[in-house]
Design a protein with these regions (language model features):
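C-terminal substrate-binding/cap subdomain adjacent to the FAD-binding core in PCMH-type
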Residues: 1-74
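Conserved glycine-rich FAD pyrophosphate-binding loop
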Residues: 25-27, 52-204
Length: 204
């Protein structure tokens, strides 16, 4: 078993646009990138493990020797989105928890939406189970196509955390979370932080 702290997978066009750390080679054309944050004991095992899956190590460095440049973690989660949109302002993004197994959902979305979707995956755990979250980059073609895309994701069993709405409730579970409201009351009783962001606070 490999002890991994985090896993990020970037589709080739996304990987090609990222500002890789000093010493890390740029991806070859068409090369996807898998970013792994591994325990020190796993570093010797990784090359053989990846080779068995048809991959190879492009760059490997211990955290203590990474230097003061851009950290690899800067290419994960929403950092990836920000780097892409700095170069491609005509794009936006979504946040999804994919159904398990994921391949059928991704294939169906790719077939319908083509290169209007570029894929970025993050490994997560939900109730102890390994899952894939996705932060796909989306070519902006207007509000109606975006709504149609989100509806298609939901039809395929993906959970959409909509980043294009104001309140936390509308972007997530769709209902007021009493624990969130209680936490805001405890830590921000005057409601100064992120005003209007928590619908449950406004409706209390």
């Amino acid at each position: 078993a490999l002890l991994l702290e985090a896993i990020t997978l970037l589709e080739a066009p996304v990987a090609a646009a990222m500002p890789w750390p000093a010493g890390c080679p740029m991806p070859a054309p068409g090369e996807h990138r898998l970013l792994l944050w591994a325990a020190p004991d796993a570093l010797e095992t990784l090359p053989a493990w990846l080779a068995g899956l048809g991959g190879s190590v492009r760059w490997q460095v211990a955290a203590a020797a990474a230097g003061s440049g851009l950290p690899l973690r800067e290419l994960s989660w929403n950092h990836t989105t920000l780097h892409w949109r700095a170069q491609h302002p005509g794009w936006t993004y979504l946040q999804l928890l994919l159904p398990h197994p994921e391949a059928a959902c991704v294939d169906a979305l790719r077939q319908r939406w083509g290169d209007d979707l570029l894929w970025h995956f993050e490994a997560v755990r939900q109730a102890g189970a390994a899952r894939l979250a996705a932060l796909p980059l989306v070519r902006w073609r207007g509000a109606e196509p975006l709504e149609a895309l989100m509806a298609h994701c939901q039809e395929l069993g993906a959970f959409v955390f909509n980043p294009h709405v104001i309140t936390a409730e509308d972007g997530g579970l769709g209902v007021v979370d009493a624990d969130q409201v209680a936490a805001k009351a405890a830590y921000d009783p005057a409601g100064l932080l992120n005003p209007g962001k928590l619908r449950g606070w406004l409706e209390r």
